[in-house]
Amino acid sequence: MLNIKWIRENKELFDEKLSQRFIEPMSSKIAMLDGEKRKITSLIQELQHARKVKSKILGNMASKSGEEFEGLQRDVKHINEKLEALEHDLNNNNELNELLNMFPNIPDEEVPYGMDASMNKLVRTYGETNPNALNKQHFELGIKLNLMDFEQTAKISGTKFVTLKGDLAKLERALINFMIDVHTKEWDFFEISPPVLVRDNAMYNAGQLPKFAEESFATTNGYRLIPTAEVSLVNMVADTIIPREKLPIRYVAYTQCFRSEAGSSGRDTRGMIRLHQFGKVELVSITTPEESTNEHEYITNASETILQKLNLPYRVMLLCTGDMGFAAKKTYDIEVWLPGQKQYREIASCSNCGDFQARRMKARYKEFGSNETTLVHTLNASGLPIGRTMVAILENYQNEDGSITIPDVLINYMGGLQKIIAYSE
C-alpha cells in the first residue's frame, strides 16, 4: 500500500508515477476522499474532548440531580449519539482504502518507462547461445524418455498438470536439494518450511489481494493456496518490530505453488512452462530502506548463481514500468536460453518492494535504545522454479539419441547418475 501522507504532499509526482504505470491521474479524487476522512476524524476528536470535559464536570458535581445535572447528561448522551454515527461512517466508508489498495507500487527512478516487455532494458548476459544446437523442446524429450506424462495426468487433474517419473522425478528432487544447499551455505539464507494454505489477510499483505483474487485458488473455508512462497515468507514478520541489529533477515523455502493462470489462455499450452501446480525455491529478504538497493543486487546474484553452476546461458533484464509486478518498485527478470524455442524465457523475477508490503502488514524495525519505529523494506526472488529449470536442462543438455546429460554439479545429488536415458516399462 502507498503512503497516504506522501500522496498528500506529492500530488503531481503521484499522478506522474501513476501515468508511468498507465493509470489515469487520481490525486484529486484521493485528496477529496482523504479530506472527508480527516474532517470526520477531526470532528470525532473534538466530540471526544467535549464528552470528556462534560463527563468530568458531571463527576465533580455535588448534586446528582437538578436541571444543570440533567442538562449535562443530555449533552453527553447527544455527543455519544453523534460519535456513534460518525464512527460508523468512518469505519464503513472504505472507498479511500479500496482505492489505495488498487494502486501498484511507485516505480523507482532507475526503472525505464515502457508499456510492455519490448521496452525492458538488457543489464547483462551469461554464457553463449548456440544457434546450431539440438533443438527439441523439453516436452518432446520428456515424452520420448517415457518419464514425462501429460496424457494420463490430464485424466486425473485436467490440463496444465504434469507427472514426472523415474530419473526425471529424481532430477526434480536433486534440483531442490542443490538449490537449497547453495542458498543456505553460500548466500546465508535461513531455510523455512512454511504452510501453502494461507488466510486472505496474508495474501493481502503480500500484495496478491484484492487485485489478483482470480489468479489464485481459494478454498471454501477462507484459505488460499499460495501462488509463491513469498506470501508465507514475508508474513513471517507481519505485525512485528524487529531490532535493527537482526537485519537483514534472509529466508529461503521450497514449496509447491498454485496458480489459476487466469488470462494466460493460448500461451504455452504444451509442456511445463505454465502449470497450475509447480515447485519453486523462493528467496525473501527483510532489510532497512538504506540497504534495500544493495540487497536487491545481492538477492538477484543469489538467483543467478544457480544458473551459473548449472552452466545455463541467461540474461538479466531490468523491467520497464508497464511490465513490472504490482508490489514491486524495481524488478530484474532472469531469462534462460531455451534452444527448443530459440529464445530466452523468464525463469526468475527478483523484486524490491520497498515498504509497500511492510505498510500493509505493519512490519517495522527500530534502532537499539530508540522508541521510534520505521517500516522495513521487503525483497523477493525466485531461486529458482524447479520445473522451468528442468526445462532448461533438458533442452540445453540434450543429446542426439534423446538422452540428457546430467550437469556436473548435480551428479552427486543424482547418486552418481551421469545421463538420463529412456525408461522401458
UniProtKB/Swiss-Prot annotation:
PANTHER family: SERINE--TRNA LIGASE, SERYL-TRNA SYNTHETASE. GO terms for molecular function: ATP binding; serine-tRNA ligase activity. One of its GO terms (cellular component) is cytoplasm. It comes from Rickettsia rickettsii (strain Sheila Smith). Pfam families: Seryl_tRNA_N (PF02403), tRNA-synt_2b (PF00587). Keywords: Aminoacyl-tRNA synthetase, ATP-binding, Cytoplasm, Ligase, Nucleotide-binding, Protein biosynthesis. Catalyzes the attachment of serine to tRNA(Ser). Is also able to aminoacylate tRNA(Sec) with serine, to form the misacylated tRNA L-seryl-tRNA(Sec), which will be further converted into selenocysteinyl-tRNA(Sec). The lineage of its organism: Bacteria, Pseudomonadati, Pseudomonadota, Alphaproteobacteria, Rickettsiales. This is Serine--tRNA ligase.
